[in-house]
Amino acid sequence: MRGRGNARSLLVQAVSLRPATWHPCLDMGHLHRPSSRTSHRNLPHVFLLFLFVGPFNCLASYSRATELLYSLNEGLPAGVLIGSLAEDLRLLPRASGRQNQQLLHPERTASEGNPPLSFSLASGGLSGQYVTLNNRSGELHTSAQEIDREALCLDGGGGAAWAGSTSIASSPSSDSCLLLLDVLVLPQEYFRFVKVKIAIRDINDNAPQFPISEISVWVPENSPVNTRLAIEHPAVDPDVGINGVQTYRLLDYHGMFTLDVEENENGERTPYLIVMGALDRETQDQYVSIIIAEDGGSPPLLGSATLTIGISDINDNCPLFIDSQINVTVYGNATVGTPVATVQAVDRDLGTNAQITYSYSQKVPQETKDLFHLDEVTGVIKLSSKIGGSVLQTHKLTILANGPGCIPAVITALVSIIKVVFRPPEIVPRYIANEVDGVVYLKELEPVNTPIAFFTIRDPEGKYKINCFLDGEGPFRLAPYKPYNNEYLLETTKPMDYEVQSFYEIAVVAWNSEGFHVKRIIKVQLLDDNDNAPVFLQPLIELTIEENNAPNAFLTKLYATDADSGEMGRVSYFLGPDAPSYFSLDSVTGILTVSTQLDREEKEKYRYTVRAVDCGTPPRESVATVALTVLDKNDNSPRFINKDFSFFVPENFPGYGEIGVISVTDADAGRNGWVALSVMNQSDIFVIDTGKGMLRAKVSLDREQQSSYTLWVEAVDGGEPALSSTTKITILLLDINDNPPLVLFPQSNMSYLLVLPSTLPGSPVTEVYAVDKDTGMNAVIAYSIIGRRGPRPESFRIDPKTGNITLEEALLQTDYGLHRLLVKVSDHGYPEPLHSTVMVNLFVNDTVSNESYIESLLRKEPEINIEEKEPQISIEPTHRKVESMSCMPTLVALSVISLGSITLVTGMGIYICLRKGKKHHREDDNLEVQIPLKGKIDLCMRERKPVDISNI
């Protein structure tokens, strides 16, 4: 089958194509024949099968039942191609009804004019919601209804829900999720019933989620190290496979716990809490952390919940008395039921493990037990009978505090009975503040001098002077109330703070002049007020996170305390108005997360406020500042300022001179943004300074050897792994006038050319041909004759632009002989033009009869006066008038021409041959030799290698 892409580059592929089932009415010659052994063994079964299905199958003799399986990702947009039934069933367009003939002879069936194929779903059902079928082409596409695998399969509980021609099927033991369709291929001639199965592949579009936001786990305090406890309510992820929950972790282990994950045979992962240290409930009874579930998608998605680990109590503590002995005084006239003392033991355990009962020791006499009643629950000792005259004055009460499974704690109470012959003073309170069961309730921050109660002091005997004072510590004062001498007012002396001390116990003591006194205990309970705002542990919360973080990445857990109690001390957390929208803060747990990927190059630092608000009325709040720094990752390649660079450099530029700066930047920071430059090609010629980006040439560059260079420069950053980019650099060499013209013809100062006396004025005689390796004006050449030698050398002139030498005047009898022209070839270079010279030898005669004579003349040093006249090149051609000569030379010339016509024709033939020979010499690749004349002119002989001048 063919793979098909989609708009999000998700593979949609038909993974299998089952062959058509065998039909008994098809041509047996084209069927696969089983082996003889198999056919003999299964012959009865095959025969029975023929008898049963043959009649039904023959009703549609050419039908074929076929099954196709495709797969695609969930969440694809509308119009994504799933598969082509016509292609995958190998059905040709406009095929005939006989499929065997169609497949074997398509050219024969195409001409029969059979009706075209058509495809249709067996019935409507749910197919229109998820897929569309093209009735002509047989192409299946996704519809506008987006396919959600979790909604299709997980909601079905692993079964199948059929609706017409479409159904959804899933297996609870696997990750398969199938969309089933029945497709009919018509017309009847090649009818097929096709079962199409579309496997819906899962993508990571769901984050793990815990069923509850707060999970509680109870661990006995005597649990040994490595104890494992399963955490109930594990996270649920509707995705399957690697996209499901893969692992768990704790945000804060407290050094006491860790997590392990176990996978059962069904692939379900359960987190286990493992005890890593010794626990003591009495030291710390609770640990709070954040449990995070993470799936295996890319990028992974996270879910979190608050994990509260409670330490359950065991009976590892016994009751304990703070004191070993107490001393109590009882007046002899005390009434029955008067409290004598209270014993109280402490057990640090909880619940039934801390249940304490009090009892007398067996050493306590029964008479004492009858006199003093001990409450076994509260430990209160009361006078149970009236004190008689014969009662002992001192009683020793040995009291036991009993705990479950413990040795009793022991305390001794020594009770001294004071015989009284008169009645003690009386203290009668009248409460102003709210009082319930002997406890006075005051609001904190009540103003100074807040009245609490009036106390009236009475002397039953009426004959003693009674004094009164306040016993105990606290911001209270007991002062006489002025209008009445025997009344006192209890009031506050300064504002009280619940958070400093919430409970006070004081006593009003009255005594008479005989030394007898009585106490009245006053208990004061402060009521908390919302007078404290939450306080962050740090006013500035500095955080860091690497860029390109996963979505919903954890940043920190905010924590603020409130000294108030109850709801007034419960703190909620909120983002400030200046916080970007992609930051989120859990109001209950204080967990701060970022929902999107951060890019350091877009923004490196974030600074915003967070609020901690209590639940008091009115609520109080405090503000902290979050300073988040995004750490850099090497996610940006170096970037050149220009796509490519071009530099113009004069030739002969000195080695290691500065050609130009290659500017490159890297948006990353630190080492990730450090860029090193290097030349990838021609590094033997060029080098680049990494620090400055300066490009230099190691050697001097000659334009005539190479006019331009193309370099590739690579920029590599210092990240791990390193990122790089390249750019193209073009270096164009600018020409300077460093090459004089090179004379190619004539090739030697010793060569000569025969000029016939019959040559007409204005006729070309020869030429000087030179080239210059420079360019532009440096290569524009001008020709001039700067020296002449011969009978009448001024008879010849040279074209300053072309170098053509022509005869100016008709040759006379006196002009016979050797004419020597010193030609200067100059360029137009700036600032100093360069030049070369060449000697042009012209021998005027009818024939060359003695070459040795001519060569001897050429070997003599000519005495030539140098003319310093510069050649003038004009755009328009110039013409010189040929001055009229005397009649005699003209007549002689005409006579010679008329008498020597044959000689003239012969001379012209020789001239033509010489011209062809010159062209041949120009094309020769031998060494070109320029031989200057010796003599007064300071010339030298130079040899040059042949130069290709085809472009001149």
Swiss-Prot record:
<dbReference type="GO" id="GO:0005509">
    <property type="term" value="F:calcium ion binding"/>
</dbReference>
<feature type="glycosylation site" description="N-linked (GlcNAc...) asparagine">
    <location>
        <position position="333"/>
    </location>
</feature>
<feature type="transmembrane region" description="Helical">
    <location>
        <begin position="892"/>
        <end position="912"/>
    </location>
</feature>
<keyword id="KW-0130">Cell adhesion</keyword>
<feature type="glycosylation site" description="N-linked (GlcNAc...) asparagine">
    <location>
        <position position="749"/>
    </location>
</feature>
<dbReference type="InterPro" id="IPR002126">
    <property type="entry name" value="Cadherin-like_dom"/>
</dbReference>
<keyword id="KW-0732">Signal</keyword>
<feature type="domain" description="Cadherin 4">
    <location>
        <begin position="537"/>
        <end position="640"/>
    </location>
</feature>
<dbReference type="Pfam" id="PF00028">
    <property type="entry name" value="Cadherin"/>
</dbReference>
<dbReference type="InterPro" id="IPR015919">
    <property type="entry name" value="Cadherin-like_sf"/>
</dbReference>
<feature type="glycosylation site" description="N-linked (GlcNAc...) asparagine">
    <location>
        <position position="681"/>
    </location>
</feature>
<keyword id="KW-1003">Cell membrane</keyword>
<keyword id="KW-0677">Repeat</keyword>
<keyword id="KW-0472">Membrane</keyword>
<keyword id="KW-0325">Glycoprotein</keyword>
<keyword id="KW-1133">Transmembrane helix</keyword>
<feature type="glycosylation site" description="N-linked (GlcNAc...) asparagine">
    <location>
        <position position="845"/>
    </location>
</feature>
<feature type="topological domain" description="Extracellular">
    <location>
        <begin position="61"/>
        <end position="891"/>
    </location>
</feature>
<comment type="function">
    <text>Potential calcium-dependent cell-adhesion protein.</text>
</comment>
<feature type="signal peptide">
    <location>
        <begin position="1"/>
        <end position="60"/>
    </location>
</feature>
<dbReference type="GO" id="GO:0005886">
    <property type="term" value="C:plasma membrane"/>
</dbReference>
<feature type="glycosylation site" description="N-linked (GlcNAc...) asparagine">
    <location>
        <position position="135"/>
    </location>
</feature>
<dbReference type="InterPro" id="IPR020894">
    <property type="entry name" value="Cadherin_CS"/>
</dbReference>
<feature type="topological domain" description="Cytoplasmic">
    <location>
        <begin position="913"/>
        <end position="952"/>
    </location>
</feature>
<feature type="glycosylation site" description="N-linked (GlcNAc...) asparagine">
    <location>
        <position position="327"/>
    </location>
</feature>
<keyword id="KW-0812">Transmembrane</keyword>
<feature type="domain" description="Cadherin 2">
    <location>
        <begin position="211"/>
        <end position="321"/>
    </location>
</feature>
<dbReference type="GO" id="GO:0007156">
    <property type="term" value="P:homophilic cell adhesion via plasma membrane adhesion molecules"/>
</dbReference>
<feature type="domain" description="Cadherin 6">
    <location>
        <begin position="747"/>
        <end position="864"/>
    </location>
</feature>
<protein>
    <recommendedName>
        <fullName>Protocadherin-20</fullName>
    </recommendedName>
</protein>
<feature type="domain" description="Cadherin 5">
    <location>
        <begin position="641"/>
        <end position="743"/>
    </location>
</feature>
<feature type="glycosylation site" description="N-linked (GlcNAc...) asparagine">
    <location>
        <position position="804"/>
    </location>
</feature>
<keyword id="KW-0106">Calcium</keyword>
<feature type="domain" description="Cadherin 1">
    <location>
        <begin position="64"/>
        <end position="210"/>
    </location>
</feature>
<feature type="domain" description="Cadherin 3">
    <location>
        <begin position="322"/>
        <end position="536"/>
    </location>
</feature>
<feature type="glycosylation site" description="N-linked (GlcNAc...) asparagine">
    <location>
        <position position="850"/>
    </location>
</feature>
<dbReference type="InterPro" id="IPR050174">
    <property type="entry name" value="Protocadherin/Cadherin-CA"/>
</dbReference>
